[in-house]
């Protein structure tokens, strides 16, 4: 058994004590990489580096981690089997599932989310390719910091989570930091009136926590899907988006699939941006079609929300209703501003119901939202807006 432990935190720990990260992976290379990355961050420390899920379950109460990076495929006890045991022992443990990009692992990751995992991250096929390793590092550290900080903020009411949006180290692509409003300041956010034009298309952007939020929302908007097209960008890699589309189809009981280049956009369908490509909208013969873009990441994301939002204006002008759900970063803010400038409207998920209030917080803080609502109120509000309500 390969086990490395850090000292347990003091009972009278400071408010901004570094996040304690438990790394659980049977690959010594992956454990070593993640350990070095975490230890290089001033606001994190490696609480334990473990080889199996059984090690994690047995050591959990001793090492007291805030965040666990949990591999799926391990000997003795795999990640999906260890997950419920870990959460039974420590309900507020933030678990980030890590897996390679296979359909089986993607399906297991979705199951893990339903069992209480906070998020997932795809591991690169090889750590020898610098860009892949850099992206994995950037995404993992951001998830640890944002999700760990979110739990701490909930534990201390009225206290903003430390350093959620800051980027202390250079990233391979720019990813602007965004100040995250607290719940207390949310009531003071400036809200606009809904646009004068009745919406003709629904656009949705989401990231961390998005799969669960999307499945909840699409189950509430059946009447809208029946009469109007719905286009979604969820930050997610290939294979994962294929499975997410299947889940959305089941949740909504309507057709849902990854967008296809040149495909006509029609009412009655949910179109999901495929992993690894931006989904834009274009006109062909005067009709809206899907346009896939294999260009560089936008806002450090591919697919990104902004390309969808901004391209849709060329087709529907002010007849757009955009919804920004839970997620890290600020993707969707620039596109949201452009939608409002064109006469459309934007709704953001509120902080209390978001896993991470980065993306929705960014659009809300930018003053472009007509409403900032709990997740369970967004679907019904969308139905009313498409039925003609402009209030």
From Swiss-Prot:
Subcellular location: Cytoplasm
Keywords assigned by UniProt, alphabetized: Chemotaxis, Cytoplasm, Hydrolase, Phosphoprotein
Posttranslational modification: Phosphorylated by CheA. Phosphorylation of the N-terminal regulatory domain activates the methylesterase activity.
UniProt catalytic activity: [protein]-L-glutamate 5-O-methyl ester + H2O = L-glutamyl-[protein] + methanol + H(+); L-glutaminyl-[protein] + H2O = L-glutamyl-[protein] + NH4(+)
Any one Gene Ontology cellular component term annotated for this protein: cytoplasm
Residue positions where 4-aspartylphosphate is found in the record: 71
EC number per UniProt: 3.1.1.61, 3.5.1.44
Main location per the UniProt record: cytoplasm
Signal sequence residues: none
CDD domains named in the record: CheB_Rec (cd16432), REC_CheB-like (cd17541)
Segments forming domain CheB-type methylesterase: 196-383
Stretches assigned to the Response regulatory domain: 20-138
GO biological process: chemotaxis
Lineage top rank: taxon: Bacteria
GO molecular function annotation: phosphorelay response regulator activity; protein-glutamate methylesterase activity; protein-glutamine glutaminase activity
SUPFAM superfamilies on file: CheY-like, Methylesterase CheB, C-terminal domain
UniProt cross-references to PANTHER family, sorted A to Z: PROTEIN-GLUTAMATE METHYLESTERASE/PROTEIN-GLUTAMINE GLUTAMINASE, PROTEIN-GLUTAMATE METHYLESTERASE_PROTEIN-GLUTAMINE GLUTAMINASE 1
Other facts noted in the record for this chain: R.palustris does not have a group 1 operon.
Function according to Swiss-Prot or TrEMBL: Involved in chemotaxis. Part of a chemotaxis signal transduction system that modulates chemotaxis in response to various stimuli. Catalyzes the demethylation of specific methylglutamate residues introduced into the chemoreceptors (methyl-accepting chemotaxis proteins or MCP) by CheR. Also mediates the irreversible deamidation of specific glutamine residues to glutamic acid.
Membership in a protein family: Belongs to the CheB family.
Name of protein: Protein-glutamate methylesterase/protein-glutamine glutaminase of group 2 operon
Species for this entry: Rhodopseudomonas palustris (strain ATCC BAA-98 / CGA009)
Lineage: Bacteria, Pseudomonadati, Pseudomonadota, Alphaproteobacteria, Hyphomicrobiales
């Amino acid at each position: 058994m390969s086990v490395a432990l850090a000292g347990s935190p003091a009972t009278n720990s400071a408010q901004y004590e570094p996040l304690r990260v438990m790394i659980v992976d049977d690959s010594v290379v992956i454990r070593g990489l993640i350990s070095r990355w975490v230890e290089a961050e001033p606001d994190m420390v490696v609480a334990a580096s473990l080889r199996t899920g059984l090690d994690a379950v047995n050591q959990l109460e001793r090492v007291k981690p805030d965040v666990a990076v949990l591999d799926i495929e391990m000997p003795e006890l795999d990640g999906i089997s260890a997950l419920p045991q870990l959460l039974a022992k420590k309900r507020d443990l933030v678990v980030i599932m890590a897996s390679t990009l296979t359909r089986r692992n993607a399906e297991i990751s979705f199951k893990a989310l339903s069992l209480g995992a906070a998020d997932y991250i795809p591991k690169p096929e090889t750590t020898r390719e610098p860009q892949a390793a850099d992206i994995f590092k950037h995404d993992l550290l951001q998830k640890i910091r944002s999700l760990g900080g979110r739990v701490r903020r909930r534990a201390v009411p009225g206290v903003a989570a430390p350093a959620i949006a800051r980027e202390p180290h250079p990233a391979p692509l720019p990813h602007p930091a965004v100040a995250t409003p607290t719940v207390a300041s949310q009531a003071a956010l400036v809200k606009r009136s809904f646009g004068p034009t009745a919406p003709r298309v629904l656009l949705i952007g989401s990231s961390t926590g998005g799969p669960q939020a999307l499945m909840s929302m699409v189950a509430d908007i059946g009447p809208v899907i029946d009469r109007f097209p719905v286009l979604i960008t969820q930050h997610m890699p290939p294979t994962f988006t294929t499975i997410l589309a299947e889940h959305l189809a089941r949740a909504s009981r309507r057709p849902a699939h990854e967008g296809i280049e040149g495909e006509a956009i029609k009412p009655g369908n949910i179109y999901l941006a495929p992993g690894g490509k931006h989904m834009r909208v274009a006109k062909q013969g005067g009709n809206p079609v899907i346009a896939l873009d294999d260009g560089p990441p936008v806002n450090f994301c591919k697919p990104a929300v902004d390309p969808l939002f901004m391209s849709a204006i060329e087709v529907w002008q002010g007849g757009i209703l955009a919804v920004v759900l839970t997620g890290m970063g600020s993707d969707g803010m620039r596109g949201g501003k452009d939608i409002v400038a064109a006469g459309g409207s934007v709704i953001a998920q509120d902080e209390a119901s978001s896993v991470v209030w980065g993306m929705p917080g960014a659009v809300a803080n930018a003053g472009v939202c007509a409403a900032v609502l709990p997740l369970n109120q967004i679907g019904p509000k969308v139905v009313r807006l498409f039925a003609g309500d402009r209030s």
